[in-house]
Amino acid sequence: MNYLFTSESVSEGHPDKVADQISDAILDEFLRQDPESKVACESFCSTGMVVVMGEVKSEAYVDIQTTVRSTINRIGYNKAEYMFDGNSCGVMSALHEQSADINRGVERGNEEEQGAGDQGMMFGYACRDTENYMPLPLYLSHRLLEILADIRHHEPELMPYLRPDAKSQFTIEYDGETHQPVKVDTIVLSTQHDEFVPASLGRMSYADAVKQYGQAKVDFEMQAKIRYDVETILIPRLKAALPEETARLVHSFILHVNPTGKFVIGGPHGDTGLTGRKIIVDTYGGKGAHGGGAFSGKDPSKVDRSAAYAARYIAKNLVAAGVADECLVQLAYAIGVARPVSVFVDTYGTAKNGLQDGEIAKKVSEIFDLRPAKIIDRFGLKNPIYAPTAAYGHMGRKPYTQAVTVQGKRKIVQFFGWELLDSVPLVKKAFGL
């Protein structure tokens, strides 16, 4: 029997994502000046204010005010009417020095034996739903909001009422036997917007339209216009951006647009934002598992982040190599200890050639060096690469290289290196595939 599975995403303007982006922008600035920086930066944002908190050990000086304000303005919160404006909001910093007790366990004379920054378990997941080995409902949720943001930033005349905050949700019907996607069942989109008068009511101010037609009529026509634009502009652009095989699944679906009827008050004025509250959006949309640790604002000595990236890399390369059609990898660490205390693999019964999950986990431990220092080196995690990860998912992104400034010099660095498939030949050889 077929079944439904749902995942959601949130836009760069969602208050929790604003906080994530602030934290990662600050982390990048520390790493840009001092790649050995140890940073745990949390951000809080609400009406007209941002508070930055956390622990740092670094030789760098970061202008917190400038970094915070430029991040907020880039997202699009640059008008006083939003009640959260990068040019005028209050910014308070409460950063202080990292605990010496923690630092003692992380920094070692032999860098290769650098201990894990904390205990815990981290998960990586991959499947064959999509070309990037991500679950389809989350993949589509991210892409829809990326396209919406692109319209808001670069073609505002198409949907001129858009504001930065938005949420999306996709429900996918799966085949009960093959567990492959059959079709999109339901799309939910809530997008923040200006109060405006649609052309159907004539040219006048919103206040005058309410006087003439009444609040209910104006708001109904306003939402009808937004829905029309979603159906005729946004959804077609989503389908055009998808691989043909995936685009064919987007048909005859249920669509909910701003189901509350109005979404004018939003962003940090509508809801408080806090770093690390969108960990399922950041990872796999509820598929697989999550160890509980957030990513943004944490330097790579924190295995919450670096080991989660490594686990995704392993799972993706295993699936791409044909070891299994679906794969969950768990890594677990003890604070101050370099090597993981356990490596676990679950292929959900999809492993090929009679392979057992325990056998796969054993080979993973042999193939991949999972000490934090080696993970950091493999993916170049001491570089300022984190700001782009803080919206639209840390996983399933397209890897690329770009020139950045580090310690006053330009260098080419890898972004989203954990999404590379460069270990597929090694995996195939190890498993005789």
Label each residue range with its predicted role.
Residues 1-40, 430:
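N-terminal, positively charged regions that mediate nucleic acid binding
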Residues 8-10, 14-19, 115-131, 264-289, ...:
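Conserved phosphate/anionic-ligand binding catalytic regions in large, soluble enzymes, centered on
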Residues 39-41, 166-172, 253-257, 323-334:
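A short glycine-rich, hydrophobically flanked beta-strand micro-motif that places a catalytic Asp/Glu
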Residues 40-58, 335-339:
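Short, charge-patterned binding micro-sites
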Residues 277-279, 284-328, 339-346:
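C-terminal catalytic subdomain
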